[in-house]
């Protein structure tokens, strides 16, 4: 008993923390602390594991998403820069003009095709449009007008579409019709005068009976009275008419079987009471081909003499009919 009490006294007297109760309490506290620490360590490990899982899963996804987001941002930045570099294409709005506006614009276009800035502004105020719209309308209208004018000029000039053969117009007077037509067309061969003789021409009954000799049909070699050969086309041919009634033989060209009507100069002059003049009227055309024996006679005459003689012959014929 004494030993136990001594032992207790020794422990309690020396230091209260060195007693068994205190030591036991300290041991329990240490155990509790160690348990708490171990529990805390376990909790930390669990938390670390959870963080690692989260980092493997969600955090990485966040990083990847942030990375993608960064890439998207960079791409968007590049696109914005490229869009800033390229000018934005504006949508073109087609202007619809009312009939009243078109009438006003057409009326001003009839006045001038090139209005100045002041006139365009005045027109824009009247029709309720902008000056730029009015300017564009005038530009389009001028282009349309030039195109239409060009087309009309092309259709008006037939020489631009088809070649011109340069055929002269038929003259009105008898002398011009006999002598002024010249051509180098040699497609038709010459025909003798005997083959071109046609049926006799008849005169209306109103003319006197003494003029019936005009309608007689005579060939170039058989006719006794001098006259004039006439083709249906109105072209003159090689004829030599003298006052004594002799007809020089000639070969001329006929288109589609011409009519040959020869009138007597002597009968015309006698019936009209005019003296017969010794004028030798000769009508020749470059289209006719003279016979070889009369070539020298035709070669010596000139165009001026032929026209003058043809005119005298026409005056003589007109005087005879009067």
UniProtKB/Swiss-Prot annotation:
Positions of region (Disordered): 41-93, 210-296
GO biological process entries: neuron differentiation
Compartments in which it is found: Nucleus
DNA-binding region: 90-149
Position of sequence motif OAR: 301-314
SUPFAM superfamilies per record: Homeodomain-like (SSF46689)
Protein's name in the database: Homeobox protein orthopedia
């Amino acid at each position: 008993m004494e030993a136990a009490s001594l032992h207790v006294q020794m422990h309690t007297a020396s230091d209260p923390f060195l007693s068994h109760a205190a030591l036991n309490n300290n041991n329990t506290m240490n155990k509790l602390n160690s348990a708490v620490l171990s529990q805390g360590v376990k909790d930390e490990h669990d938390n670390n594991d959870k963080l690692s899982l989260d980092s493997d899963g969600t955090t990485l996804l966040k990083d990847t998403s942030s990375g993608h987001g960064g890439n998207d941002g960079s791409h968007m930045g590049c696109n914005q820069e490229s869009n800033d570099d390229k000018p934005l294409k504006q949508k073109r709005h087609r202007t619809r003009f009312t009939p009243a506006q078109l009438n006003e614009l057409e009326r001003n276009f009839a006045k001038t095709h090139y209005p100045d800035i002041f006139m365009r502004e005045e027109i824009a105020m009247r029709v309720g449009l902008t000056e730029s719209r009015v300017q564009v309308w005038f530009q389009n209208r001028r282009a349309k007008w030039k195109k239409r004018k060009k087309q009309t000029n092309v259709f008006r000039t037939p020489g631009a579409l088809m070649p011109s053969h340069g055929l002269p117009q038929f003259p009105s007077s008898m002398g011009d019709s006999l002598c002024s037509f010249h051509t180098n067309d040699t497609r038709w061969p010459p025909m003798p005068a005997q083959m071109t003789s046609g049926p006799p021409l008849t005169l209306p009954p109103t003319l006197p009976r003494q003029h019936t000799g005009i309608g007689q049909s005579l060939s170039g070699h058989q006719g006794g009275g001098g006259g004039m050969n006439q083709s249906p086309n109105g072209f003159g041919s090689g004829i030599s008419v003298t006052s004594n009634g002799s007809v020089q033989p000639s070969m001329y060209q006929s288109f589609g079987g011409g009519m040959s009507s020869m009138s007597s100069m002597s009968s015309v002059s006698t019936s009209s009471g005019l003296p017969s003049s010794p004028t030798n009227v000769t009508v020749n055309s470059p289209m006719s081909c003279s016979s070889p024996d009369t070539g020298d006679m035709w070669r010596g005459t000139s165009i001026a003499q032929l026209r003058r003689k043809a005119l005298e012959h026409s005056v003589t014929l007109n005087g005879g009919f009067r």
